[in-house]
Amino acid sequence: MNAGNPMRLALSHYLRTLRERDEFDRLLPELLTQMGYVPLVKPKAGVRQFGVDFPAAGRSSVDGVDELLLFVIKQGDIGRRTWSGDPNAVRESIEEVIDVWLASHVPPEYKDHRKVIVVATTGDLGQDAQPNWAGFATRHPQLRFEFWGADKVSDLVETHLLNEHLFDGQDRADLRKALVMGADSDYRFDHLCRLMLRQLGIALDGQLSEAGARQTVPVLLKALRRVHLAALVCSHWIDSESERRQALWVMERTLLWSFHRAVLQSLQERQDVQEVIREIWRSYLQAASRYYDAVAAHVRVKDGLSGYTREGAEYSVLLLEQVGLLASIGLSAALAEPGQDDAWRARSSEFATALAAMLRNHEAAASPRMDAQVIDICLALVLFIQTGQHNVARRWSAEITRRLNFVFMLGRMFPVGTDSFDDLVELDVHGTDEFKGLTRRYSWLLATMGSWCATLGQDSAYENLAENHANAYPDVGSQLWHPTADWPSTWYFEAAQHGSGSTEAPYPLPASAQALRDRIAQFNATGRLRWEENSPALAIGMWPLDFIACRHFRTPVPASMWYYLDSKPSHGIEQNSGTAVPPSQDPDD
């Protein structure tokens, strides 16, 4: 393998991470198809196959001879221990192919084809097993043997799966650039995104391009699989460079844009489209699990994440980013459809508990410095509610509200109402009164935390906030955004609030919490906020996508997630009266 070729290096890394079942054995038939072979059966676990995981018939590109390839699939490196001595060892599998499959299972139409036994693995043939391999082949001169290790398969994948028939020159160039630049923690995979847009037929504005409008469903399915493969190569490559946050970002973007493409033509309920989307979903879960494993130990240590930055403002930004990531991972489990991904769904409490531990050990997470961090805060609160940790939600929302009130009264260290970290630094270092006024003209946090406190029964924290907002900092504009019925058209492609929805501005904060609850109840009675009723993701059992999109694109979490808090169903199915009341006190979670 060319060590200077980042594509092949990435492919080789990627292949070495695949499981034998459901991953490597799904890739090989697709590869063989592109090579001009016809896989005769699909690999099946639990079915006795007499050594052959799957056969494939075709014509050799080397000498033009018709041949029947008999694949024996293994995982990892082949050494002396995995060569022989176990019923599932390589030698025993090959002998079963010779003794049974070749003797009685060759289809009649292929009896004259040349027979080639191919041992395919995600690793290498170790030096200690190479003499055994050579000796075995010498003792069976009537047969041909080939070993396809990770390097060999990566060469074939690049040649046949990532070739000019699937990726044109520009796509291949963009994929290579994404691999080279992917280890940069600030890189946002512009090159990979351009590849995805071209493959999926999406224009820069999120609508169908001319090419996309011409795509048939079979063509789209192939494009989705190609995009998935390109994303996997990038994700695994940068994961190997210890950039798991970047690897997770790639899988988030691929999942969301693939689903957006399906929604553009209302194809998401087609079974064949769903199957491909769920394959990408499973890849997202794997990336999410790897990211969680990387940070889990740090969040349980007092200020365990402080080693990644020194500046106070930067530390707050880092912490709230981790809050949003852990919360979206937790919601991917908590809101998973029963009967699907049950093992992952069972981990929802684990993720919520880890997030609660992080908040205890990192008190600065209750001091947001950017108004957009309200998104991460809301995702965390929704996770706590969905997993039954109501008291954690109450305590943390009240603490954030108290600190928010304090910094606005102080006139320093308040969350800036822009997305610019430079504005935050400017404010802290030498912000003028005029600049301070500009950066706190509007606040999502005021309305959001005030309404969270009211619905969670944190009346004291709310009423203190409302009083001081009215008297000490009335210049701060409180506002709240609500999606409108057309929200799915952009939700999975970009930040939805810039081109759709409606904003309550100013958002009134009455003196008493009960007055705000009464106002929320009146709002609920209109039925305007049941945004999930229009969710194409919820309709097919993939509601977590809506919340992953909130964090990824920085779209505010819809207020209905806490406006209907007294009877919010786990999957948005049950109806309620629309009456907002503070929840009853329950024991500590």
Predicted regions: what is each one?
Residues 1-589:
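Mixed-charge (Asp/Glu-Lys/Arg
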